């Protein structure tokens, strides 16, 4: 299953806010009433688990196969499968760029990486799924177009919104740079999600 490329507001109406996918929100009262009415209807446990899975998948811009791969990796790791799953997704390079404010959305961050604008520890990385580690330094290529792209995104940055596992700074030459302090904790996850529902969805399909 490929990545979703349709209208993003349609997804928000169905799955509620997806900050990684879009910074748009439903502002009209009619749309909000429709969501509230649908939420009040009795739905099956399967549909609840499916919605949680879809929220996680669409927020991070993953295909079904990619998300299933992460679930399997998390299942083999020590600790809570759900929390490990969220950590794996949060520590992806495209998500780190988004959480640092270097891009407005995760799809936009993916393009920055694919177009070779991003460095990790002063080395060019063009793989959005690259797994960042503590002490990694995220920076932008020393090229005019790369710097302009990221600095434009940073104009609306609220540093108070940067999670505790990351640090953002501007160097003396005003070049943006991010630092990974540690592995993300559950409290700093960027999406309101019940990860256990996602794990249950896949465990019942296995």
From Swiss-Prot:
The keyword Transferase does not apply. One of its GO terms (molecular function) is rRNA binding. GO terms for cellular component: chloroplast; small ribosomal subunit. It comes from the Eukaryota. Residues 91-159 form the S4 RNA-binding domain. One of the primary rRNA binding proteins, it binds directly to 16S rRNA where it nucleates assembly of the body of the 30S subunit. HAMAP family: Ribosomal_uS4_B. Part of the 30S ribosomal subunit. Contacts protein S5. The interaction surface between S4 and S5 is involved in control of translational fidelity. This is Small ribosomal subunit protein uS4c.
